[in-house]
Amino acid sequence: QVAAIKDYVIPMCFKDNKADHYIGWDSLRTRINNILTSEKCKVNEDKLLGPFFISKNMLDEIKNNKEQIDELEAKDEASRTEKDNEALKDMHQKENNYIKAFESKVIMYLFEDVMKMRPENIFIGHHKKNGKMIFSEICKAFEQDGEGIFGIEDLENI
């Protein structure tokens, strides 16, 4: 089951009514965990993000949604039916819902439970941009900058 974790993706940055890009969930959580265990944060192992911190059901849903989007977007625009376009619109809305779920699950956990006294040590990218260290501002920044709020700039887009 852990081998399958490498196949899961997370949508990032909701721009132009769709996700700007996707990154691997395992890569992202590993990088966040590396930040959490760094000298600046020194978080205990029991507070790290496990492979299924985001539920397997949601990870499966996200993966299936992305596969359907890729399939429809591979079609020539002129050959897409009205039904295809409506389906794409719905799938892109789901991407936004997944981004919101990431905020309410992962970002909230990191902000409230893990780094409540020092949020600038995990939300490094947001802090460097002089962003306010309040939950709503961090979420807004996440919708614009995705993984960049953690100071992560080099994960492969999928």
Regions found by a protein language model. Give the residues of each.
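C-terminal regulatory/interaction module of P-loop NTP-utilizing enzymes
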Residues: Q1-I158
